């Protein structure tokens, strides 16, 4: 579990609730999925200001004067929490920090997340001043996803490099740090062990949790043993073993599978199956669908080195799915994540695709939903602040027209999104 020194920023928006707007709203008659695994048929959720004040059965008393929202036949659950996403220097299928890592573009991305029901995003890397500023404004956000940031990803080879970079990023006051221990399938230089060990030590000395990007089981085990607080990607080279499982469960370290990240490395070799899906199109930037259908672009990709790597990641995806099922069965807490934000990893849409892929990997719809709500918040040390429908939590609500427990794709049947007690979409 990650616990950050800046958790008070996350709590601030809760304490401001009464002053902001004290309207009381009761959602009645719907199926309540509370983010912990509990279901209440025909339940009641009461919101006052920015926070939830009561959750219970139909008999739950409704305060006098409350506005009643009848959601019979619908499902209400917490806004989804992405434990590993990004706000990025991306526009369409282009990436350019100088042009695109701007406040207006980041706000647009956070609004896109929110339109798809993702109301909190932990951006794990490449975060700069505009991202930090938006994080600091979470208390007033009602039309975009809440944002937490890790700052620049820490790299290096020597202990001095790892320690210095960790200290430099920590001085920016991020919510956590992130290291990258990967060689991109032997095409890049991996972060040196002295550097990542020093970075972990420095993070903990500054009371900051640290997430680790890995690919190989050996690196996952080594960084976990050294104190990593979140395994931010799937192990993709081989089956996980008992020692790794024990390391995760003994320290209650969470594991973020990011299955759609692997999918994005090869799926554009042909036209992706969702390119004309209205649910995808509602968040797609102009021109993107046409580019994804462009045969010449696909042909150029298939002739590239990136495509060759994608074929290896395609095989890694199958390993990742099996490992996800194994880890969940063995009691490891799963932190829903997508690594969305870079080109081709579509914010909002990919989160729903990730849920579908998690269920295809063997999780139940409820297990996937808990990973994407209560457990995602818990894995970042923020239980009770958001991600669950409980007294005192942020009134971030996702209302669906149908039942996602019957078919996980029903998360796409979005009726409304509420953020901090206000209807946003």
What name fits each language-model region?
Residues 1-10:
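Bacterial N-terminal signal peptides that target proteins for export
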Residues 32, 36-77, 96:
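Histidine-rich, glycine-flanked metal-binding segment
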Residues 87-103, 155-160, 183-191, 304-312:
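Acidic/histidine-rich helix-loop elements
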Residues 106-129, 144-153, 173-184, 209, ...:
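Divalent metal-dependent hydrolysis catalytic cores, especially in the metallo-beta-lactamase
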Residues 164-187, 237-361:
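Active-site neighborhoods of metal-dependent hydrolases
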């Amino acid at each position: 579990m990650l616990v950050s020194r800046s958790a008070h920023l996350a709590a601030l928006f809760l304490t401001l609730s009464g002053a902001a707007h004290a309207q009381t709203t009761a959602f009645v008659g719907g199926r309540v999925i509370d983010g912990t695994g509990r279901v209440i048929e025909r339940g009641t959720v009461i919101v006052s200001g920015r926070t939830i004040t009561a959750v219970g059965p139909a008999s739950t008393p409704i305060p006098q004067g409350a506005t009643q929202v009848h959601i019979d036949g619908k499902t209400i659950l917490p806004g989804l929490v992405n434990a590993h996403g990004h706000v990025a220097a991306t526009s369409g299928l282009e990436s350019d920090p100088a042009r695109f890592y701007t406040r207006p573009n980041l706000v647009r991305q956070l609004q896109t997340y929110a339109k798809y029901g993702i109301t909190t995003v932990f951006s794990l890397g490449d975060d700069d001043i505009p991202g930090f500023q938006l994080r600091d404004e979470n208390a007033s956000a009602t039309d975009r996803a809440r944002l937490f940031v890790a700052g620049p990803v820490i790299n290096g080879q020597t202990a001095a490099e790892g320690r210095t970079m960790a200290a430099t990023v920590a001085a920016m006051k991020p919510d956590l740090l992130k290291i990258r221990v990967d060689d991109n399938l032997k095409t890049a230089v991996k972060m040196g062990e002295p550097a990542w060990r020093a970075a972990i030590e420095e993070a903990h000395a500054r009371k900051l949790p640290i997430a680790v990007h890995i690919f190989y089981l050996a690196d996952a085990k080594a960084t976990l043993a050294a104190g990593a607080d979140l395994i931010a990607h799937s192990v993709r080279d081989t089956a996980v073993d008992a020692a790794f499982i024990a390391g995760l469960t003994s320290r209650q370290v969470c594991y973020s599978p990011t299955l759609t990240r692997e999918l994005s490395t090869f799926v554009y070799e042909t036209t992706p199956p969702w390119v004309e899906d209205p649910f995808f199109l509602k968040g797609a930037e102009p021109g993107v669908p046409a580019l994804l259908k462009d045969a010449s672009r696909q042909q150029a990709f298939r002739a590239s080195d990136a495509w060759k790597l994608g074929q290896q990641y395609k095989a890694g995806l199958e390993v990742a799915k099996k490992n996800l099922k194994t880890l969940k069965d063995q009691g490891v807490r799963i932190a829903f994540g997508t690594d969305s934000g870079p080109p081709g990893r579509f914010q909002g849409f990919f989160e729903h695709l990730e849920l579908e892929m998690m269920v295809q990997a063997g999780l139940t719809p409820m297990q996937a939903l808990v990973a994407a709500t209560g457990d995602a918040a818990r894995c970042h040390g923020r239980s009770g602040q958001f991600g669950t429908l409980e007294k005192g939590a942020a009134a971030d609500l996702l209302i669906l027209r149908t039942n996602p427990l019957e078919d996980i794709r029903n998360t796409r049947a979005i009726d409304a999104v509420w953020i901090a007690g206000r209807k946003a979409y």
